[in-house]
Design a protein with these regions (language model features):
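Outer-membrane beta-barrel porins/channels
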Residues: 24-38, 42, 47, 105-107, ...
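Short intrinsically disordered, low-complexity coil segments enriched in acidic
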Residues: 1, 6-7, 89-94, 272, ...
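Short, intrinsically disordered low-complexity segments
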Residues: 1-3, 68, 198, 240
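Cleavable N-terminal export/targeting peptides
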Residues: 1-30
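Hydrophobic alpha-helical membrane context
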Residues: 15-16, 67, 211
């Protein structure tokens, strides 16, 4: 009788934000599971349920049984904007504006393996997954609060003396692209398996900002949403004992965001300046990628190397917005 395994992993991982942990594309995120943050390589994984997203074909190489895994990734972030002490003849207070709002990124993975086939399901955050909150505004709100001769709304907000020094500002934003994947894999030979499936992406972005001056105030809220399907394919090859190679192709996800906007600035000036006036559409795809991973035991069962490469196909995506 084959050994049956039920693996249930619930991981709460608290990490500091570093560039390596957030590695990905312009929009894509690679930190889809806690085990990726722990190892920084999962493209050839055949050991845990998150193989469903990193190496879907490799799920057919796992031992028979049910594998389940739930992750909650808590990322501590510290972003800052350094402001100038002056813009031309206009003196500013300068200094640094900070946001230390953490990000909470969930992940859910399930794999069922039987004989030569497997089925899997996962919920991940393949894009976005972040939140910022600048209680005193940031560089953008500072520029928007400049006096009218400098191209801002400072005169409207604060009267003749209105400028960033005497206008209260704040801005916050969050973005989550939730991906739901369903697929399967089949072991053609003992050394080769193929897999694939479909992914549904529900993308959401929200931006909220406000400014208060002696004369007027401005409130802006922008929600951008869209949803789409894409597909993925995978191959897993184990040519010799202790060596495994995983290959995954994720197709481009076409997203055409629609803006739902409330803007009290004169003539909707703020939302129009970024191209997100109410009802407007903007293509901003979630690019596809090719992931390759190698896992090799130098010393069987003791020492293993796992080089990984993920190449994002951003040239094939349509990105109309300025990034």
């Amino acid at each position: 009788m084959r050994k049956r395994i039920i693996a249930v992993g619930v991981v709460l991982l608290i990490v500091g934000l570093a560039s390596s942990l957030q590695a990905g594309g312009v929009i894509n995120k690679q930190n889809l599971s806690a085990d990726y943050l722990r190892t920084l390589n999962r493209n050839a994984a055949t050991d845990m349920a998150d193989a469903a997203v990193y190496n879907p074909a490799g799920t057919a190489m796992m031992q028979d049984g049910l594998y389940m895994k739930a992750d909650v990734i808590y990322l501590m972030k510290d972003y800052s904007n350094q402001l100038p002490s002056a813009i031309g003849p206009l003196a500013l207070t300068g200094g640094t504006l900070d946001s230390d709002e953490p990000s909470i990124i969930p992940g859910l993975f399930a794999v069922y393996k039987q004989d030569r086939w497997s089925v899997f399901f996962d919920v991940t955050i393949p894009g976005g997954g972040g939140e910022v909150k600048y209680n005193d505004g940031n560089a953008r709100t500072t520029m928007l609060s400049l006096p009218t001769p400098f191209g801002g709304l400072g005169t409207y907000l604060g009267g003749p003396t209105g400028n960033p020094n005497n206008i209260d500002q704040s801005i916050e934003a969050d973005s989550y692209y939730v991906g739901y994947s369903l697929g399967g894999a089949f072991k053609i030979f003992d050394s080769l398996s193929l897999g694939g499936g479909v992914r549904y992406v529900d993308a959401y972005q929200e931006f909220k900002g406000k400014a208060r001056g002696a004369a007027n105030s401005v409130d802006v809220k922008i929600e951008r949403t869209d949803e789409a399907f894409n597909y993925f394919l995978g191959l897993d090859w184990a040519p010799i004992r202790d060596l495994n190679i995983g290959l995954t192709y994720m197709s481009n996800t076409k997203l055409n965001f629609k803006a739902d906007t409330t803007d009290t600035s004169p003539g909707d000036a703020i939302s129009r300046s970024v191209g997100w006036a109410d009802g407007t559409h903007e293509r901003e795809d979630l690019p596809g990628y090719v992931g390759v991973g190698v896992s090799y035991f130098i010393i069987p069962g003791t020492l293993r190397i796992e080089p990984n490469l993920t190449y994002y196909l951003e040239q094939q995506a349509k990105l109309e917005g300025a990034r």
